[in-house]
Amino acid sequence: MRHYEIVFMVHPDQSEQVPAMIERYTSVITEDGGKVHRLEDWGRRHLAYPINKIHKAHYVLMNIECSQAAMDELTHNFRFNDAIIRDLILRRDEAVTDLSPMKAAESREDRRSGGDDRPRRSADSEERQSASQDEEE
């Protein structure tokens, strides 16, 4: 069986259907004896350029191992599903299981925004600081 990396973009009006699509596509892979090594739902993101007057899309990344028959069925499903506006399928040499750069950057931002233990500067503290500097002069 071969390894593939798949990214597909779903029309933003169909974002509610993404979990069902993912379930359908993973069942196609696993029923044929394949494996899903990595599955990341990147959510709704802004497109670099409009596609059919659409400016946002829901992105999904999958790293899979499957047979050619399962891959043919997946490409057929992608082609005839109107909710999928673009898809990209790349053949890989081995399974990729670590976080993608998109997901890693997202988790770094979550960690950074979650660190509320350091004091924040507010407008009141800045006013007090400028007032104390004026008094010193």
Swiss-Prot record:
Single GO BP term? translation
What's one GO-annotated cellular component?
A: cytosolic small ribosomal subunit
Keyword Ribonucleoprotein recorded: yes
Q: Which InterPro entries match?
A: Ribosomal_bS6, Ribosomal_bS6_CS, Ribosomal_bS6_sf, Ribosomal_S6_plastid/chlpt, Transl_elong_EF1B/ribsomal_bS6
Matching SUPFAM superfamilies: Ribosomal protein S6
Q: Where is the composition biased (Basic and acidic residues)?
A: 105-129
Presence of the UniProt keyword Phosphoprotein in the record: no
Keywords, A to Z, come to: Ribonucleoprotein, Ribosomal protein, RNA-binding, rRNA-binding
The UniProt family comment states:
Belongs to the bacterial ribosomal protein bS6 family.
Query: So what does this one do?
Result: Binds together with bS18 to 16S ribosomal RNA.
Question: What's this protein's name?
Answer: Small ribosomal subunit protein bS6
